[in-house]
Amino acid sequence: MAEPGEQRKFVLGRCCIFHWRGKASIIIPLITLPILIYGFQTDMAEFKCLWLIVTMALLWITETLPIYVTALFPLVFCPLLGLVNASIVCKQYFTDTIVVFLGGLIVALGIEYSNLHTRIALRVIRIVGGSPRRLFVGLMSVSTFMGLWISNSAGTAMMCPIVKALVNELDTNKIFPVYMTQEEEPVEEGEPPHPSKITVAFYAGIAYASSIGGLGTLIGTGTNLVFRGIYTERFPTSTVEITFANFMFYSIPLMVIVNVTLVIIAFLITHMGLFRPNSKTGKIIAEANTNRKLMEDVLRQRHIDLGPMSCHEIQMAIAFAFMIVLLITRKPGFVPGWSDLINRKVVGSASGLSFIVLLIFALPTQYTFFKYCCGKGPFTAQAIDAILSWEYVLRNIPWGLLFLLGGGFALAVASRETGLNIMISKAMQVLIGLPNIVVQSITFVLANFFSAFNANVVVANIVLPILCEMSLALELHPLILTLPACLGISMVYFLPVSTPPNAIVTQYAHIKTKYFACCGIVPTIIGISVALVNTNTWGLIIFPESKSFPDWAKEIKNQTKI
């Protein structure tokens, strides 16, 4: 029988293990309390704001509280500590940027609800071909395209069942080994088998492609919208407006097309035996190519099983195309956009997206009632569904992300109003004199590193406001630092926790972390290199003003007395 002292230690140990969040939620604010006390003693709002940011950062990193709940802290503490009025803080939780994000998610759900994504994927894969390498290229291409227009997590979630269906067909027809053997990776009884090297490439490929596609447009990922919101809030007099069009022109040529091409080539070499015909993987692929006709027949049959394109799918495809046109032509930059021609009031991207959202909730999936109206068919007693169901949206929208974005914008406003940004800028002046490429590399690698262990949007909310102030202190155009860092935050390929697509595929396909981390080494190096080249070459063409420190930035710097 255990001694009473030993039993107490055992109970205490179990309590610490299973109830650590409750203790940490008290300990973390106590650890940061000296910052707040100093703020009250010196009556410096900067340190009160610093306490709030540090406390929220620690709670976000440790996930002591749900990250979405932590994002609500500014609603309580900004007014309570006298940092910002409650009315101003509340407005940050439903800005134009957040409405754009919400609209993009709803349109993505409309595509999923109509099953349009499956038809697009199968069509593209059939065009590309049925060999394993061609299948991989097709899956990567579809994932990249979807990542451009819908959130990368939604795109990955849509692609996973498609990949699983293909993998099951490959396994059934014995085209190549899709799972590891017991000798290669032992599995406990009842556990699912681990995917083979080639199968890992399929799943990791769609995750990386979705993340890369998300770099291409403002609605592709939450970090892009965080960047736009923070940049607009901090630099309201900037002559460079971050529009859907110029962000797209900046990112797609190099950050998306070149980046994904290099990543595809890297995967084909490392995981599919390209240029290595005598390797084990190369021999497996060569043997699988002999069954290419069988795989093409399977794909064709799956495509035929979908049947002809329904009225539901056609309408959703038209709405999707119309959304793209509205977003690009709102303010393209080189010619007046439709928002300039309508009236003198500012019409943001949220207006165009909201119109599409209203449209897909209003239009029916089919128009059989016209037959009755024309006397050519019986009366349909049943109600006809809309293109998108509100109940489906309620179940599938990640509402917490809206709070996360709003919390970041509220912190940015608090930093500006209290002067914390000035204090941070002065601390960054040690970097004055370093070449731009060196400063960019430092900020990019740090942003990438922190994103490896935390949610992308959380890191963006913490890092981007600091880089805005750093750019003023170093007298660099803010886009030179903030834009590549924004992209770097999304290009984290090492760990499952780094991005939502990574987490989705590792859980869905039961991929071990060590295999997933190995996949991410080369794509990360490619991403960092392409981002730095893009910023200092193509980026200077799209944003020519970023070559020098602009007058409006000088005025902001003088006003803040950096």
From Swiss-Prot:
Membrane disposition: Multi-pass membrane protein
Highest taxon in the source lineage: Eukaryota
One of the Pfam families matching this protein, by short name: Na_sulph_symp
Main location: membrane
Protein name from the UniProt record: Protein I'm not dead yet 2
Keyword list, A-Z: Membrane, Transmembrane, Transmembrane helix, Transport
One of the record's GO cellular component terms: plasma membrane
Entry's localization field: Membrane
Keyword Transport in annotation: yes
Gene name as annotated: Indy2
